[in-house]
Amino acid sequence: IGAVSPPGGDISEPVSQATLRIVKVFWGLDANLAYKRHFPAINWLTSYSLYTDRLADWFSKNAAPDFMELRGKLMTLLQEESELQEIVNLVGMDALSAPDRLKLETSRSIREDYLHQNAFDPTDTYTSLGKQVLMMRAILAYYDKAKEALANGADIEMLCLRSSYIF
């Protein structure tokens, strides 16, 4: 484990780069996530592991055969959300197509329901691999079914209703 906190967060300086070459994993802490009370405040777009390919077999055997595929789909949605969020910030949500709005809604679920933790809650402190797989499948099942419903003429507003609006 190597921990580096360079001045100004500039990880391009030599000590940080040497550490990254040795540990081959980077968890990018994000002040914006912390300000939004999203913990752990690890940025999923800047963080990486060079061990992912080596661990694929382990996850296939110990979590689910399709674990890496599920992970890849979630990461793709989060990356697309980042691109779409730039458009929303410039011209507003109304400029997005229904499928793009669905991507944003699904990504919100990934962030808030899957990646967000409350370390003080006994249930939320730790999640087993089995539960993680079920959560990933549930989020992606929602996305696939909602995409199908959109193709059949469903209203995006109804597909994106949060439970707080229903009760």
Where are the predicted features?
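P-loop NTPase catalytic core
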Residues: I1-Y165
